[in-house]
């Protein structure tokens, strides 16, 4: 899960009134992509220039392209974003349909617009799509932060010690086409319980990260 978030972000700020919008990818116009690309550059830039590079121009996605987005707007424009893409992943030889969640970001000037708030909007959409699980990956360093935001609230289960194999977003002559990462897996039970999540310590995305 591409994620840009302040470590102090836990509760919604009283300084901003955010309106949430659920958008299918085909509903977005060029102006929407341009606004989102600018938002991502400003959100991911502080985490490293490399993380902002995919959003040059008006490109509003980094790896795989989402099919649905939850976008938070306030008086200053885009305030927060999370994307969704349905796909099959493979765990221990089992093919599993999931809704991958990624492209999560909060505008740097907003403290406290936590992922739990965007998930309150996204969760009903996951239920309508009929997926068994929502799925995402983050850096292990964010485990304590995600535990505060979604783990303790019962929104998700965090699974450390998992390796995820993905493809690069593009083909590069000087890089392997495959990426293998040790990440923290975040699972949102939707149509099934966590007891039905397949056992395994390696997940194949068979495609690029969202």
UniProtKB/Swiss-Prot annotation:
Key word Transferase present: yes
Superkingdom of the source species: Bacteria
A GO MF term: acyltransferase activity
Broad EC category: transferase
Annotated localization: Cytoplasm
Classification via NCBIfam families: nodulat_NodA (TIGR04245), PRK00756.1 (NF001974)
Function according to Swiss-Prot or TrEMBL: N-acyltransferase required for nodulation. Acts in the production of a small, heat-stable compound (Nod) that stimulates mitosis in various plant protoplasts.
Name of the protein this chain belongs to: Nodulation protein A
Record organism: Bradyrhizobium elkanii
